[in-house]
Swiss-Prot record:
Positions of Mg(2+) 3 binding: Q823, E835
Annotated ranges, domain ATP-grasp: 133-327, 674-864
Residues where Mn(2+) 2 binds: E298, N300
Cofactor note: Binds 4 Mg(2+) or Mn(2+) ions per subunit.
Official protein name in the record: Carbamoyl phosphate synthase large chain
Region entry Oligomerization domain, spans: 402-549
Stretches for region Allosteric domain: 933-1067
EC number: 6.3.4.16, 6.3.5.5
PANTHER family: CARBAMOYL-PHOSPHATE SYNTHASE [AMMONIA], MITOCHONDRIAL, CARBAMOYLTRANSFERASE FAMILY MEMBER
Residue span(s) of domain MGS-like: 933-1067
């Protein structure tokens, strides 16, 4: 039992939906913490709104509440469950803010709930900018000259006093939200206004900019006895001025002298002791590169993105140790699971280099401002491990899945030196490639360091890589000898990079490696630099001599993970991968995971029998398969990243379990799939693949507008658009064929019907459909961005029968063994198939949780040869539950400057929440609250700007809203039509007209909800785009689909928002 015998039932607060700044790392830390508590025999009650997480599984906690993370709903859970303790530091900023609010409102006192781990007072000292600054002054730790600001005038006065540039840092926000660097008064007014609005306590720290200093982080652990260690120190390659979540980070630090390292280590320990942290804490410093001057930037008094990275970089389980400390254990009492003999008080030592590179979503947002600053924009990250910096860095580049295997990028070749300089002075996500091009052209390293703030140490490494690339380009395959090839492999060059530069195929390099016996060896991540024997089966590749992998003769299966979190391929695929691993291990099969995402549960070495932290490229995967010789490889759960390897593995005669490469092609190749549908007599929207602009226009004339256009072989609707006329189609096709002329563009007649979705399991003979899901928004909104209801609410029995019939026919005809995801449209009483994915989809965690069917477990067992009829869940459509569950998407567009907000066929959401109720209205209300959507609870003024062919439908909704007490503001045309319909509407001037116009009303927050149906999506020159952006940046609700507005109307008419709602334990 824990040292504190009073702790028997602990409430753990999760972090909610995946958003920029708060991603899968909190599923990893939350899962680890829950397991650590259960190990001690403590009952765990978990509240989290995100259904796509492992931590919300019944195996992880004793009670699981998928409820909105608000004081109101968490109080209901506390009232029902009566926990004696609350663990606050595992749910990111969301969990921390919620714990503070519960404490301040007296709810924790009311129910006698004690906060364990870091106290609320310590959390406040770490989070409140003023308290933290005062504390630093008391313990003589230097902070940057700054002032706490709560109004605009005081901010302007302070900036004038200290001079520009200044940094704006709002209190209690996430990922630098609302902050930024202001170079002049105009920029300050804009950033400060936003920061004060977005801070939960209306407080901002305004500080003198030390942009260009080094940014160094220490991950520190402290127990309640005052024992303290540094787990890991990390160096941002990018200087202060770029958010650490958007920086390339290396561990351990590479450029600090011993004196600097010890100075900052001592400072971090002094800080964590002064604040009184009990558990994990991240301390960030700015270090002057030309002296020993430093300043404390901030601390995170909780587990964080950096602590997930530090855990994976060192093998030290920070969240688990923090949870044990919260129970009263000392660091010297907690065993290190990696060695099995040392304790958590041993500081890890690393004999390798770790590099983290962020993954940005700009492929989804063509018009986005890509310049990096103090506001985080990355959706995810990769981590790479190497025996030297260059090897880890190049592994990192190829892990990003951006089609790059070296530091060469074609788009920078034609830029002038002036243009390249601009790209690194205002750094963006591609700055490394611009910088490499400058070095390639002989730009002086000291000058590059001066303008970028990047240390000369790293620039010299980049220059060496660039020089080797140039040598290769000037050589032929005959010039390559064993010594040179081994040197390149040791420095991280992939076969593909070497082959591209020598203009041969990667197979040719692989053949030479085979002849010359140049094979990777695998080293263990052991936390102790090889000082003690390690038990952790956690490996990275190197081309050094000694290999630490012991290959067994057991039956074994490799599971390919899904790589970094990105829009369209999120945490749902990690959920599926982890469940696949669990199912295999239950069957006694040795399970090997290959993945490169430091945030996820799948890369926790305790999950699988072996973990290879490697890029998911053909070469890196093949090297491991060559080594392990598994009985099979599973690709179905790793999203498109894994599926893309199917053809390659087939060519190499490597067995894949479940659906084969040919079957995947049958589902994804347009012509083959159309032939199959014709044979099965299943309808699909009319259309075809076209290879040229002329052919596309001809097909569009035949089908009639509107037309849905998209590239083949994509994920998350990437590049998909609805075009309404020939001008729009010409613009789209011209751009699409410029990007990719080797594949056709798919053109479909756009049907505006109801969208229906199923995830099904097939064993080749029978099919099980765990549930039929209905999308609230009509077709044309990407399925990942639609509100999804289960059980389906508006589908006739006849259509349900057709859904099952079509699903069976498709699964059996394709030959699916395992999972299949199918999307349908019901249009004018007829069912059409619009998409088939022969793999796990992003709805798998949702439908698994709400139907009670362990989908991944069943699918995995089928891949191993079992039959559906023997697994206890039957066949056909599974019985529907009594409760209604609604999945609501969550967007991070507020954090990305100048990107589109409206819903459309390209996916834009980063996460999701669940709403569970006795009926669909209760579920929707909870979903809206959990997703921080507009619910009408706080204000009832609507700005309506509606396109012509939506006006009739809008008027019907406006009548209902009028009866519900809403006020309308509209531009001349819409206002006139509202008045003609008997609805009072205030007229407002358009953008660009004299004040007060639409923008003034939005800026002054005189509007509570913007209803705007876009005329031309993705056109940032139009007024609608500016209205949507201005609203979202000021936390004003925006709805761009009338279906979403209709849902709001219905739940208000039903009174779901005024009812006393229950909370439900889903176990």
């Amino acid at each position: 039992m824990p040292l504190n015998k009073d702790i028997k039932k602990v409430l753990v607060i999760g972090s909610g939906p995946i958003i920029i700044g708060q991603a899968a790392e909190f599923d990893y830390s939350g899962t680890q913490a829950c397991q650590a508590l259960k190990e001690e025999g403590i009952e765990v009650v978990l509240v989290n709104s995100n259904p796509a997480t492992i931590m919300t599984d019944k195996e992880i906690a004793d009670k699981v509440y998928l409820e909105p993370l608000t004081v109101e709903f968490v109080e209901k859970v506390i009232e029902k469950e009566r926990p004696d303790s609350l663990l606050a530091g595992m749910g990111g900023q969301t969990g921390l803010n919620l714990a503070v609010e519960l404490y301040e409102k007296g709810i924790l006192d009311k129910y006698n709930v004690k906060v364990i781990g870091t106290s609320i007072e310590s959390i406040k000292e770490g989070e409140d900018r003023e308290l933290f600054r005062d504390m630093m002054n008391r313990i003589n730790q230097p902070v940057i000259q700054s002032e706490i600001i709560t109004d605009l005038d005081a901010g302007i006065a302070f900036a004038r006093k200290i001079g520009y540039p200044v940094i704006v840092r709002p209190a209690y926000t996430l990922g630098g939200t609302g902050g930024g660097i202001a170079n002049n008064e105009e920029e300050l007014i804009e950033t400060l206004t936003s920061g004060l609005q977005l801070s939960t306590i209306g407080q901002v720290l305004l500080e003198k900019s030390v942009k260009g200093w080094k940014e160094i982080e220490y991950e520190v652990m402290r127990d309640s006895f005052g024992n303290c260690i540094t787990v890991c120190n990390m160096e941002n390659i990018d200087p202060v001025g770029i958010h650490t979540g958007d920086s390339i980070v290396v561990a351990p630090s590479q450029t600090l002298s011993d004196k600097e390292y010890q100075m900052l280590r001592s400072a971090s320990i002094d800080i964590i002791n002064a604040v009184g942290i009990e558990g994990g804490c991240n301390v960030q410093f700015a270090l002057n590169p030309h002296s020993f001057e430093y300043a404390v930037i901030e601390i995170n008094p909780r587990v964080s993105r950096s602590s997930a990275l530090a855990s994976k970089a060192t093998g030290y389980p920070i969240a688990k140790v923090a949870a044990k400390i919260a129970l009263g254990y000392g660091l010297d009492e907690i065993k290190n699971a990696v060695t099995g003999m040392t304790y958590a008080c041993f500081e890890p030592s690393l004999d390798y280099v770790v590099v983290k590179i962020p993954k940005w979503p700009f492929d989804k947002f063509q018009g986005a401002d890509r310049v990096l600053g103090t506001k985080m924009m990355a959706t995810g990250e990769i981590m790479a491990i190497g025996s030297n910096f260059e090897a880890a860095f190049l592994k990192g580049i190829r892990s990003l899945e951006i089609g790059k295997y070296s530091l060469e990028h074609k788009k920078f070749k034609d830029l002038s030196m002036y243009e390249l300089r601009e790209r690194v002075v205002s750094p963006d996500d591609e700055r490394i490639f611009a910088l490499a091009e400058m070095l390639r052209r002989g730009y002086r390293i000291d000058m590059v360091s001066k303008i970028t703030g990047i240390d000369i140490f790293f620039l010299e490494k980049f220059r060496w890589l660039v020089e080797e690339e140039q040598k290769l380009k000037q050589s032929t395959i005959d010039d390559l000898n064993r010594e040179w090839l081994l040197k390149l492999k040791r420095r991280g060059f992939s076969d593909k990079a070497i082959a591209d530069m020598l203009k041969v195929s990667p197979d040719e390099i692989y053949r030479l490696r085979d002849i010359w016996h140049i094979k990777p060896s695998y080293k263990m991540v052991d936390t102790c630099g090889g000082e003690f024997e390690a038990l952790s089966p956690y490996y990275y590749s190197t081309y050094e001599q000694y290999d630490e992998v012991v290959v067994s003769d057991n039956k074994k299966v490799v599971v390919i993970g899904s790589g970094p979190i990105r829009i369209g391929q999120g945490i749902e695929f990690d959920y599926a991968s982890v469940h696949c691993v669990m199912a295999l291990r239950k069957q006694g099969i040795e399970t090997i995971v290959i993945n490169n995402n430091p945030e996820t549960v799948s890369t926790d070495f305790s999950i699988s029998d072996k973990l290879y932290f490697e890029p998911l490229t053909e070469e890196d995967v093949l090297n491991i398969i060559d080594k392990e010789k598994p009985d099979g490889v599973i690709l179905q759960f790793g999203g498109q990243t894994a599926i893309k390897l199917a053809k390659f593995l087939k060519e190499k005669n490597i067995p894949t379990l479940g659906t084969t490469s040919d079957q995947i092609d049958l589902a994804e190749d347009r012509e083959q799939f159309d032939d199959l549908l014709e044979r099965l007599n299943i309808a699909r929207p009319k259309g075809k693949g076209v290879w040229s602009l002329e052919e596309g226009l001809e097909e569009a004339r035949r089908l009639g507008f509107p037309i849905l256009v998209r590239p083949s072989f994509v994920l998350g609707g990437q590049g998909m658009e609805i075009t309404h006329d020939e001008e729009e189609l010409t613009y789209y096709l011209t751009n699409a064929f410029e990007k990719d002329s080797k594949n056709p563009i798919l053109i479909d007649k756009y049907l505006m019907g109801r969208e229906i979705e199923v995830d099904a399991i097939s064993d080749g003979e029978d099919v099980l459909v765990p549930g039929i899901m209905e999308h609230l928004e009509r077709a044309g909104v990407h399925s990942g961005d639609s509100i999804t209801m289960y059980p389906a609410q508006n589908i006739s029995d006849k259509i349900k029968e057709d859904v099952l019939d079509y699903t069976k026919k498709l699964a059996l005809s394709i030959g699916i063994k395992g999972m299949i995801n199918i999307q349908f449209i019901e249009f004018e009483g007829k069912l059409y198939v619009i998409e088939v994915n022969p793999r796990a989809s992003r709805t798998v965690p949702y439908i698994s949780k709400v139907s009670g069917v362990p989908i991944v477990d069943i699918a995995t067992r089928i891949m191993l040869g079992e039959k559906l009829k023997d697994l206890g869940y039957g066949t056909g459509v599974y019985k529907e539950p009594e409760l209604v569950s609604v999945k609501v998407p969550v967007f991070s567009t507020q954090k990305l400057p100048n990107v589109e907000v409206s819903l459309g066929p390209e996916m834009r959401s980063t996460g999701e929440v669940l709403g569970v109720g006795r009926n669909v209205f209760e579920a929707l209300y909870k979903g809206f609250v959990g997703a921080s959507m507009y619910t009408g609870d706080k204000g009832k003024t609507i700005l309506a700007t509606i396109k012509k062919h939506d006006k009739k439908e809008f008027m019907e909704l406006a009548k209902d809203l009028d009866k519900l007490g809403y006020n309308f503001i509209a531009t001349t045309g819409t206002a006139k039509e509202l008045r003609e319909a008997g609805i009072d509407a205030k007229e407002v001037r358009r953008i660009g007209e004299e004040s007060p116009n639409i923008m003034d009303l939005i800026k002054n927050k005189e509007i509570d909800l913007v209803v705007n149906t876009p005329t031309k999506a993705n056109d940032s020159k139009r007024d609608g785009f500016h209205i949507r952006r201005a609203a979202i940046e000021r936390n004003i609700g925006v709805m761009t689909s009338l279906d979403t507005l209709k849902a709001l109307v219905e739940l208000q008419k039903e009174g779901a928002h005024n009812r006393e709602l229950e909370v439900f334990n889903l176990i």
